[in-house]
């Protein structure tokens, strides 16, 4: 059996996958769709598993997103496809290149390990997100700036992506667990590891979301209070500025009546 790993597939890669390996075109198109949800499908002799994995971008507006990782396999090939350059996949390839070969591992074991790796990378990126939250919080304690608030808003979007994808991966894992029989104690232990890491990632993501939501509400209250203070000061200044005008008006009226 051969493992084929493809990132950012070219036109030649697509031709190889669809024409040479005969992978169903629908599977390939689903992997290309960034919004595709995790699931399991079978067509002809191919089994298709779609998993959501975390991805760190260079876009400040969406620093962390999630993207599809497609796993397509039959008795001869185990193919992984993603349209993004993913740290997870490089880490996974390095792991197997130093420890074991693909021939030594069955499909269920590999898929569970991809699940495990995805959860681990979610946790790694969540730690980076936590650091960004703390840095933005420290900056906001000194002075509330639009840039820092925008940073928190962008992080909040990333956490929404993480929460949604982690829940979808959890549903996929339970579905996979119910459809596939665990063969031995090692696979049972691996499945437990996957469930533990996935639950930890889900809980951590929710905690950070709640913390960030509370922070945003607090800063919104601070901004509102500051605005009220400014409006009161402006009102006071306006009243003070009106006093000379009022006196002049009264004096002018008295002069007119005297004449």
Locations of regions flagged by a protein language model:
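Peripheral, non-transmembrane regulatory/ligand-interaction domains of membrane transport proteins
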Residues: 1-180, 184, 190-193, 197-202
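Hydrophobic alpha-helical transmembrane segments and their immediately adjacent juxtamembrane loops
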Residues: 16, 22, 199-259
């Amino acid at each position: 059996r051969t493992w084929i790993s493809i990132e950012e597939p070219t036109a030649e890669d697509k031709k190889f996958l669809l024409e040479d390996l005969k992978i169903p075109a629908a599977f390939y198109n689903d992997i290309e769709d960034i919004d595709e949800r995790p699931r399991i499908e079978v067509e002809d002799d191919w089994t298709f598993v779609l998993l959501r994995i975390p991805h760190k971008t260079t876009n400040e507006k969406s620093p962390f997103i999630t993207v599809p990782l497609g796993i397509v396999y039959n008795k001869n090939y185990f193919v992984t496809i993603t349209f993004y350059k993913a740290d997870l996949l490089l880490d996974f390839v390095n792991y197997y290149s130093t420890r074991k070969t693909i021939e030594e591992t069955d499909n269920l074991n590999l898929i569970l390990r991809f699940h495990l790796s995805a959860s681990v990378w979610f946790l790694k990126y969540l730690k980076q997100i936590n650091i960004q939250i703390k840095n933005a919080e420290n900056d906001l304690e000194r002075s509330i700036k639009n840039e820092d608030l925008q940073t928190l808003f962008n992080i909040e979007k990333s956490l929404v992506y993480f929460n949604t994808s982690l829940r979808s991966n959890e549903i996929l894992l339970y579905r996979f667990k119910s459809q596939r029989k665990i063969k031995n104690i090692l696979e049972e232990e691996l499945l437990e590891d996957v469930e533990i890491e996935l639950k930890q990632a889900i809980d951590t993501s929710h905690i950070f979301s709640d913390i960030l939501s509370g922070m945003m509400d607090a800063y919104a209250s601070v901004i509102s209070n500051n605005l009220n203070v400014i409006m009161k000061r402006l009102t006071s200044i306006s009243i003070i500025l009106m006093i000379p005008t009022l006196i002049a008006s009264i004096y002018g009226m008295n002069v007119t009546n005297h004449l």
